Amino acid sequence: MDIAPIYKRVIGLDVHQAQITGCAIIELPDGSVTYERREFGCFKRDRKALAQWACAVGPDVVVMESTGIYWKSPYAALESVGIVAWVVNARHVKAVPGRKTDVADAQWLASLARAGLLRASFIAKADLRSLRHIARHRQKLGGILASEKNRLHKLLTDAGIRLGVVVSDLHGQSARAMVKALIAGKTVPEVLSLASKRLRASREDIFEALQAEEITAAHRFVLLEIMAHIEELESRIARFDAELLRSLQEAGYGVPLQLLQTMPGIDLMGAAMLLVEIGGDMSVFGSAQRLASWVGMCPGNNESAGKRKSGRIRKGNAWVRRLLCEFAQAAGRSRCALKDKFQALNVRKGHKRSIVALGHKMLRTIYAMLAKNTHYVDKTVDYEALMVARNAPRWLQMRSEEH
C-alpha cells in the first residue's frame, strides 16, 4: 500500500563526523518525483554550501538524525539562513535491514519525512543551547568537587583523624579551618581552639577526634594538594554560577527563574540549570506528560495480553533527570506536601523509586507553573503563619519577595 505524501519538497541529511550526505525529494507539478543527491564535507565552507543548496531547493522539511554532537554545526548553518531542521531520534528511523549506504540513509530519512512519519525532537533556542555549555560544565565541576572532598575525608580517616564523626560538614567553615591547621602541622590544642562554639559535639569529643596515629609527610603533601584543588574548584564554580545567572538575566529569564525557586527543593542555581535545559516556554512540549517523556521521568509503558507490567523509566535528558532527583531529595526533607508524598511512596516503593516518582511529580508541577506563569502553591501550608516565622523555609521567603 502506497503512503500518500504530505510534503512536496523534503531534504534528508545523513550526518557524519567528516561528511554530510543530502538527498532531496521533489514532487513536480505533474505528480512525478525527482531525486537530487549531494555530498558535502565537514568544514565551515562545506556547511555554508549545504545551507545554500537547501535554500535553492526550497524544502518544506529538512530532516537529520541526532548523531552525537555532529548534527549541531549543520543545524546552526541551516538556522543561519532561516531553515529550522528537524532533528529526529535515531531509534525512530531505523531502516529495514539490507544494503546500507549514506545515500540510502539520507533518502530513507527524506521518504519518512515526506510521508509525515517523523516527529521532530525538542531543540532549545540558540541562546539556551549556548548557555548549556556553561551549565553542564558547571555540573561536571560539581562532580569533581564532590569526588575531591571524598578523597580528603578518606585520607584523614587513613591517618586516624575522625573529625567527620563529630562535625556534620567536614567542609564547613570551622571544620575546614581545623583541617588546614592539621595540614600545617599545628598541635591538637591549637587546632581545637579553631573549633566553633556552635558545634554540637563536646570539646572532649573533638579533641579525641583530632588525635591521629601519625600524619606522615606523604599524608601532608596529598592533603595540601587536595585542599588546594578543592578551593580552586570552588572558586571556578563560583565564576560559572555568576556567568550563568548574568546571562539568564540578560536573556530575559528573570521571571521564570524566580518562579521556580518558590517550589521546595529548588534553589537559585538549581532553577538556573533546569531553565537552561527545558526553557521557559512550555508550549513547545504541549503537555506535562510529553515533557516528562522527553526528560525520561515517566513510568515505562509495558502492557501485554491486557496485563500492565512494571516498566523502567525510558532514556531521556540525563542532565534534567539528575537535577530532578536532587530536587526530590531536598523536597523530601522540607516542610511541605511533597515531603508527605515522598514518605507515602517510600513505604511502598523504597527510597530510590520514590525519589524518581517524586521528581516526576515535581516536573509536572514545574510545567504547570511555567505554563501559567504562577508560583508554587501548597494547599497544606499556612503561608501567612510561616512568612512571619523567623525560621521560614527559603522557598517561602522567595514567594514573599514577589509581593
Where in this protein do the model-derived segments appear?
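A detector of single, family-specific signature residues
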Residues: M1-E401
